[in-house]
Amino acid sequence: MAKDNKDGGEVVESTIDISEIPGEEKAAILLLSLNEEDAAGIIRHLEPKQVQRVGSAMARAKDLSQTKVSAVHRAFLEDIQKYTNIGMGSEDFLRNALVAALGADKANNLVDQILLGTGSKGLDSLKWMDPRQVASIIINEHPQIQTIVLSYLEPDQSAEILAQFAQRDALDLLMRIANLEEVQPSALAELNEIMEKQFAGQAGAQAAKIGGLKAAADIMNYLDNNIESVLMEGMREKDEDLATQIQDLMFVFENLVEVDDQGIQKLLRDVPQDVLQKALKGADDTLREKIFKNMSKRAAEMMKDDLEAMPPIKVSDVEAAQKEILSIARRMADNGEIMLGGGADEFL
C-alpha cells in the first residue's frame, strides 16, 4: 500500500502479497482494467451471487494503488503464460485462464455454461428474483416442482423462499429435497413450461443430479435459527434417521473450531471486524481462543478489549453476524481456499 513520506519525498510502495488479495477484488481489478464492453461480456456469464460479490468489490475499488493493480496484472499474466503452449486443448486453456482471472468457482461455472450449457434457463432466471417473488410463483405448484426449484437455487436463496411457506409445507419440502437424487427430463420440461420458456430439446436425455441430503443441510444452514429448530424437531418426529443424517451434514458457527489454523487465518482476512466482533459476542470460550490465537497479538488484545466494552446486543444480531461469517466460509470452501469439517466425514 502507498505510504506518505513525511519529508515530502517520493511516495514509497510496499510489496504486495498477491495471495492476501481476495478473489473478488482481483476479479474487480481485472474487470476495471478492461473496456466496458469486454467487462460486460464477462459479467453477463456470471451467476447472480457472483455478480453481486464482484460488483461490490468493483464499487469499493476507488483508491487502488498502482502497485496493487500492477501486482494483480502481473500475477494474471504469469498464470496465463503457463497455459499458452501451442497444442494445448482450448477447453483446458479457457478453464485455466478464467480460473486465474475469476477464481475457481466463478470460472468453472462460466466454462460449464460456455462448453456444456446449463440445464434450464427457466430455472436460471429465478436466481435473479427476490425470494418472496419466487415463492409467490411456485407456492401453488406441485410439491415436485417446488422441490426441483429449491434444490436448484443457491441454498441461501432457497432458505428465504422456504421461510415463506407454512411450517407443514416447509417441512414436507425439506424432506423431499433430502430424498431427491435426480430429476427426470419430463420434470424439467414441465418446469420450463411453467416458467414460460421455450427450450425444446435442451433439457437433454440425462437426469439432472440435484437435491439430496447435502442440499437439505445447506438450506437448513441458512434458515433463521427459530425456523430451523422447528423444522428439525418436526422432521425428527416423522423420520428421526433422516433428521440425524441432515444434522450431521450441517455446519454451524461452533464448527469453525474444527477448521485448521491456516484456514482460520484466511477466513479472518475476509471477515469485517465489526461482523467478527458481533459474532464472537455469542461464541463460546473455545472458539474465541481459536480465533484469537490466529490473530496478531495486538489485534487479539484489541478485539478482547472491544468485546469487554461492547454493550448488550440482540441475539438476532449475533446470529446474523455468525451466519454472514459462515456464508464467507462456505464460499471460500467452494473456492478450495479452506476446508470445513462438519459432524460427518463429508467436507463442504
From Swiss-Prot:
What broad class describes the main subcellular location of this protein? membrane
Q: Which UniProt keywords apply?
A: Bacterial flagellum, Cell inner membrane, Cell membrane, Chemotaxis, Flagellar rotation, Membrane
NCBIfam families reported in the protein's UniProt record: fliG (TIGR00207)
| UniProt xrefs under Pfam families | FliG_C, FliG_M, FliG_N
* Entry membrane topology: Peripheral membrane protein
Instruction: Tell me one GO biological process term.
Output: bacterial-type flagellum-dependent cell motility
Protein's job: FliG is one of three proteins (FliG, FliN, FliM) that forms the rotor-mounted switch complex (C ring), located at the base of the basal body. This complex interacts with the CheY and CheZ chemotaxis proteins, in addition to contacting components of the motor that determine the direction of flagellar rotation.
- Compartments (UniProt record): Cell inner membrane; Bacterial flagellum basal body
The root-end lineage is: Bacteria, Pseudomonadati, Pseudomonadota, Gammaproteobacteria, Vibrionales
Q: Gene3D superfamilies, from UniProt?
A: 1.10.220.30
User: The motif Part of the EHPQR-motif: which residues?
Assistant: 141-144
Its family? Belongs to the FliG family.
Any GO MF annotation of the entry: cytoskeletal motor activity
Site, Part of the EHPQR-motif: residue positions: 176
**Name used for this protein in its record:** Flagellar motor switch protein FliG
Q: Name one GO cellular component term.
A: bacterial-type flagellum basal body
